């Protein structure tokens, strides 16, 4: 089962039966759920309709949505997850599963197009268009005007997705957990996203110098290290603030779903906490030159996921891991709802898999 909740939030949901080229049936049902806390919301953004051509295995889809809850049923391989991924693409300018845009074009096709038709709380329509042809640059437009920077779109349509791929947050490398922080913070804080982009650009340049087979003057290193330090301090500070505010929300969701059976936590480690980031980079330079890349910096930060006092990767059962991930994503939704100016869309893909009956009932 695949679902998404509209920008009206999780207060009361209603589904409408609709059809399309694919057997994705929508059920009529009422849902109610109360979330803790009140959001600081100035507007809603409802996805009214989506049009998809040649995206992954979806040849042609035209769907109109309920403004509340939409639930999709179908056999494996019919395209339910790809439909959610198309909605995700409209928010983040990329696929949740495959960042190589050309590989998302349907086999035997030369292009894909995704169009989303949204409506703000005041009735203002918003049209988001993404199109790509093979061997050409992706086009991303809002109301027929192309973005000069895709980063300007991030946060306009906030979104949270719960999917089986979330297991990488526990079992994958630290880059997966940094990406989690980046995705959340970037949706409500433009300063963070700009600093992250500047940091990564400077990191690429510094790594190029580190790989140089000829001697590089210190002044050249300092240009990029100073940029990394300046942007990195912003990234560190905002990640630290986010985690501090996020932990109690996450713990509250986990406690509710597990019925207080376990305690969980998050801790954040960063080289920027050890000393001035510029000094950290300078001190690490000789070793970095030997290795050919930057060993220290906020690109090596770690978000530790704990069950009790131990890493959940080592201690958690399948059910505990799934509970942890669902609580993490529902807390992300609630956090963005409280912090941002627009209620996020919430996409749920096989949310109940690996959970026992009592935890399913709590959700």
Question: Where are these predicted regions, by residue range?
Answer:
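An accessory alpha-helical subdomain
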Residues: 168-258
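Conserved lysine of the Walker
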Residues: 80
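Short hydrophobic targeting helices and cationic amphipathic motifs
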Residues: 5-8, 14, 23-26, 31, ...
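Nucleotide-state sensing region of NTPase/ATPase domains
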Residues: 91-176, 182-188, 192, 247-252, ...
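Conserved NTPase motor "head" modules and their coupling/switch loops across ABC/AAA+ ATPases, GTPases
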Residues: 30, 40-75, 216-347, 354-362
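Helix-to-loop junction immediately C-terminal to a conserved catalytic motif
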Residues: 88
